[in-house]
Amino acid sequence: MLEVIHTGLNIGSKTLLHDISFIIKPGEMVAICGPNGAGKSSLIRLLCGELKPSSGEVRWEGKSLAEWNLLQLARQRALMQQHAEVGFAYTALEIILLGRHPHHLGANRPQDYQIAMAAMQEVGAVHLAEQIYSTLSGGEQARVQMARVLAQIWESSQGARLLLLDEPTAALDPLQQHRMLTIARKWADKGDVAVVAIVHDLNLAAQYADRIALLRDGRLQAIDRVESIMTPAMVEACFDLPCVLLNHPDGGTPMIAARRHPSSSMIAT
């Protein structure tokens, strides 16, 4: 279980996150949404332990992240970053094998290659295995990075696992966006994996997440079931976007559509 307890983050004199609290259980997928500059990426960096909170704490499986052995934590928690720069001519397979490093203390083992290939199969990227990562398109790189983090937490024997995704759909076309979130949903449905994903598209978030967390100006505006978050009042309060509520014709998921004629105040901002 992931617990965020009255957590704040200051960088220098600037406060990026204010008194944030929530709990996410394995088997659940939570989407973090909010306008640009809301603090979404800062929050996910706190959740993975890359940043240390200025106040409060983040706990995984009942223990503060600061108390975890880093190697053991890396076997249970993986972060797919929004931008992953690679300075060497690694193949896609070699990038994915990086996710296996916490599981061995030397050369890759046969099972590491098997898991890496299974992860590539999971994201539909087997054909990219021997291609140089830097020559791939943004969308292909995103799929390789997804395979890397899946390979990192592949084994259920490690106990509960945490999958953190920082804008996993950012570089993808619509089909690949849905494929990526379908994979995230599948892993949450395993029952022992908690998934947290930053998603800019509220309608995408509503289709795949159990709950949506709305973040604005570093403050948690709300975290609730999709039906409670996807209301015109809630969305306008977070995004300053006048909108109407629709229901998806396939399944009835609540969807948001911006009003066709924005106000002059919207244009000005």
Swiss-Prot record:
Q: Principal place where this protein is found?
A: membrane
Q: Name one GO molecular function term.
A: ATP binding
Q: What parts of the sequence cross the membrane?
A: none
**InterPro entries assigned to the protein according to its UniProt record, in alphabetical order:** AAA+_ATPase, ABC_transporter-like_ATP-bd, ABC_transporter-like_CS, P-loop_NTPase
Q: Its domain of life?
A: Bacteria
- According to its UniProt record, the EC number is 7.6.2.-
The record's keywords, sorted A to Z, are: ATP-binding, Cell inner membrane, Cell membrane, Membrane, Nucleotide-binding, Translocase, Transport
- Does the UniProt entry include the keyword Metal-binding? no
Q: Where does ATP bind?
A: G34, P35, N36, G37, A38, G39, K40, S41
- Look up and give the membrane topology term: Peripheral membrane protein
The family classification in the record reads: Belongs to the ABC transporter superfamily. Heme (hemin) importer (TC 3.A.1.14.5) family.
Quaternary state and partners of this protein?
A: The complex is composed of two ATP-binding proteins (HmuV), two transmembrane proteins (HmuU) and a solute-binding protein (HmuT).
Q: What is this protein called?
A: Hemin import ATP-binding protein HmuV
